[in-house]
Amino acid sequence: YLSEHNEDVILKLIKNNQLKFEEMFVAEPHVFICKDHPLAEKEMISMEDLRLYPYLVYEQGNNNSFYFSEEFISMLDFPKSIQVRDRATLFNLVIGLNGFTVSSGVIDQKLNGSSIIAKPLDVDKTMRIGIIKKKNIIFSRYASYYVEALRRHL
């Protein structure tokens, strides 16, 4: 995704490597929480609402910049944060610890079950979700089918 905090850096890297960002949709950030979370009944969740709960983020490794972070907001903004390496662990901690993570709001119940829900985050920011591909390259038939399937699903 591209956002106001990472767009300049990522687009420069894309350009320098003869790549192209193709936007699929624009999303407003959402909080992923357990359906039984104390904030689950709220229509919209504020940053202040989240301060009491652990923020779950993917470990980025020692050499990765925060510009490549999968999360939309910095873990520095929250007193409690836990780094995880995989989605299953993240969702188990969302459920077990009343934790949360922030993402696009796109969640598939067939893949993730019905225990995790997405609630809008009360921020005036957007995420431009897309794919990155080589410039001047035509997708194979299978790659084209895959991208079209993604578009239909989203």
Model-derived segments and spans:
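Extended ligand-binding regions for polar small-molecule ligands
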Residues: 48, 128, 132-154
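Secondary-structure junction motif
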Residues: 47, 51-76, 139-141
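Short helix-loop capping/hinge motifs at secondary-structure junctions, enriched
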Residues: 36-45, 123-125, 136-142
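Beta-alpha-beta core module
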Residues: 15-28, 89-138
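Short secondary-structure boundary segments
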Residues: 3-5, 35, 62, 104-107, ...
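Flexible hinge/capping segments at coil-to-helix
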Residues: 14-29, 33-55
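A local structural motif
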Residues: 72-82, 116
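Paired acidic/hydrophobic, glycine-rich loop segments that form the ligand-binding mouth/hinge
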Residues: 1-12, 99-104
